[in-house]
C-alpha cells in the first residue's frame, strides 16, 4: 500500500474548466462519438487474469483512516493510492487517456460532461451487490448528470458556507450576522474581521455562486450582467480578504490565524478535530447561509481502459458496505448517502447539520451546474481581476 499525504486538510473540489481543458474535452467528445459506444460488444476471447493491484486517484483526507488497509486485508489486492489537488488535474489525466488509474473521485458537474465525453467505463451492477443500500433520492439527483446511474457510484457529500471563531468574532462585533453572507460580502462587516483574518476559497465557481446567491440572483446564472454584479460585490470586499485558499485555511482556523473563512462544511469538521488533537479547544462554528449555498455529491468512477476493472468493482462494492462507509464518515466527517449506514454513524456526526443538513437547510441548497467553455473563460478572466483587486 502506498498512501502519500500532503499533511494538509481536505482539498477543494474546484469546478473551473480552463480553456485548454475545454478544447481537449470538445475533441474528446468528437473522438468518442466516432469510437465504440458504451456497452458495445467486445471480443469474446477471455481476458487474461488481472494482477492483484488497484490504482486509486483521490483527494487528500478523503478516505477513512483504515479503509485502504482493510480493503487490502479483505481482498489481497495491493492498493496504490495517489492524490490530486484539483479537478483540473484529474480531468487533464483523463483527457490524455491511459491514466493507469482504476478508481477516481469527482463531483457531479465534472463527471457529467466527462461521462458524455466517454471517459468512464459503465458499472457492472452485478458486481455491486451493496448498491441496494444507496439512497434512491440521491441516485435520482445524480441521474441528472449520469442518466440511469450507469457510471457514478455515490460516495460522499458536502456543502459550502463559512466557518468562524465565535470568540474572535464576538470580540469585534457582538451582534455579528452569523447566519448570513453579510459576514463575507458586506464591506462594513467584513472590515471588522480584517485584523483577525478573513479567507475566501480559491475557487471561482464557489465564490461567484455564493456572491450571486447573496445578490438574490440565480447562482448558476450565465448572464454576463449577473457576473458583472458579482464582480463588483467581490471587489468591494477584496481589500479585507487576507488570502484566497482552499486547503491551508483548515489549519489556520485551528490555530487562530483566521477568524472567518469561506469553507466546505466537512473541512470545518476536520478543523475541529485537528484543533482538539492539538490540545486546542476552539469555539468554532459553521454556517450554511440563509441566502443559500450549494451541495456537492462526489462519486467513484472507473476511467475508460482501467487496467483492473474487476478490482475496481470490488473496491466500490467494499466502499458501499454500510460498515465501511459509516467508518469513513466517522473518521473524516463527510456525509454519506448509504441508508443502511446511517444507524452506524456517530450520533454527534449524524445530528450535525453541517454534515447532514435537515430539511430546512436542504430547502436552500442548490446543485452546481456545468458551463460552456465560452462562459467559463469569461468567469476565469473575472476571477483573475477579483483576486488581483483590479
Region spans (language model):
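Conserved C-terminal helix/tail region of periplasmic/extracytoplasmic solute-binding proteins
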Residues: 251, 359-390
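Short, low-complexity disordered leader/linker segments with a strong preference
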Residues: 1-53
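Early extracytoplasmic/lumenal segment of secretory-pathway proteins
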Residues: 32-35, 40-114
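Extracytoplasmic ligand-binding site segments that recognize negatively charged/polar headgroups
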Residues: 105-240, 245-254, 271
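Short beta-strand->loop
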Residues: 121-132, 182, 278-294, 303-305
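Periplasmic-binding protein-like
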Residues: 227-236, 242, 280-301, 350
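Mature extracytoplasmic/periplasmic domains
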Residues: 298, 303-364
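A ligand-binding cleft/hinge motif common to bilobed small-molecule-binding domains
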Residues: 110-113, 260-281
Amino acid at each position: 500500500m502506498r498512501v502519500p499525504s500532503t499533511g494538509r486538510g481536505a482539498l477543494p473540489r474546484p469546478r473551473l474548466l480552463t480553456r485548454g481543458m475545454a478544447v481537449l474535452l470538445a475533441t474528446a467528445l468528437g473522438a468518442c462519438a466516432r469510437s465504440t459506444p458504451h456497452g458495445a460488444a467486445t471480443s469474446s476471447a477471455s481476458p487474461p487474469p488481472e494482477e492483484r493491484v488497484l490504482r486509486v486517484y483521490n483527494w487528500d483526507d478523503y478516505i477513512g483512516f483504515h479503509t485502504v488497509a482493510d480493503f487490502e486485508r479483505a481482498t489481497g489486492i495491493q492498493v496504490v493510492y495517489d492524490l490530486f489537488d484539483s479537478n483540473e488535474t484529474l480531468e487533464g489525466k483523463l483527457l490524455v487517456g491511459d491514466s493507469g488509474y482504476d478508481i477516481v473521485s469527482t463531483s457531479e458537474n465534472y463527471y457529467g460532461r466527462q461521462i458524455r465525453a466517454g471517459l468512464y467505463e459503465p458499472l457492472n451492477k452485478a458486481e455491486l451487490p451493496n448498491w441496494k443500500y444507496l439512497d434512491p433520492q440521491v441516485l435520482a439527483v445524480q441521474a441528472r448528470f449520469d442518466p440511469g446511474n450507469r457510471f457514478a457510484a455515490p460516495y460522499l457529500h458536502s456543502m459550502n458556507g463559512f466557518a468562524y471563531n465565535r470568540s474572535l468574532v464576538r470580540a469585534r462585533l457582538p451582534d455579528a450576522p452569523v447566519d448570513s453572507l453579510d459576514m463575507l460580502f458586506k464591506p462594513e462587516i467584513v472590515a471588522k474581521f480584517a485584523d483577525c483574518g478573513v479567507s475566501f476559497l480559491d475557487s471561482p465557481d464557489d465564490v461567484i455562486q455564493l456572491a450571486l446567491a447573496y445578490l438574490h440572483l440565480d447562482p448558476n446564472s450565465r448572464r454576463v450582467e449577473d457576473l458583472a454584479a458579482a464582480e463588483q460585490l467581490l471587489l468591494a470586499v477584496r481589500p479585507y480578504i487576507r488570502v484566497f485558499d482552499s486547503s491551508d485555511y483548515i489549519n489556520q482556523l485551528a490555530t487562530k490565524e483566521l477568524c472567518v473563512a469561506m469553507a466546505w462544511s466537512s473541512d470545518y469538521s476536520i478543523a475541529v478535530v485537528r484543533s482538539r488533537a492539538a490540545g486546542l479547544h476552539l469555539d468554532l462554528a459553521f454556517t450554511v447561509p440563509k441566502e443559500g449555498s450549494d451541495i456537492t455529491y462526489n462519486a467513484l468512477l472507473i476511467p475508460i481502459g482501467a487496467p483492473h476493472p474487476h478490482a475496481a468493482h470490488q473496491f466500490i462494492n467494499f466502499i458501499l458496505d454500510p460498515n465501511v462507509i459509516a467508518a469513513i464518515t466517522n473518521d473524516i466527517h463527510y456525509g454519506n448517502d448509504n441508508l443502511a449506514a446511517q444507524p452506524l454513524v456517530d450520533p454527534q456526526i449524524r445530528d450535525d447539520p453541517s454534515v447532514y443538513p435537515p430539511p430546512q437547510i436542504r430547502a436552500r441548497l442548490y446543485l452546481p451546474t456545468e458551463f460552456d467553455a465560452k462562459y467559463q473563460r469569461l468567469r476565469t478572466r473575472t476571477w483573475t481581476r477579483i483576486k488581483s483587486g483590479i
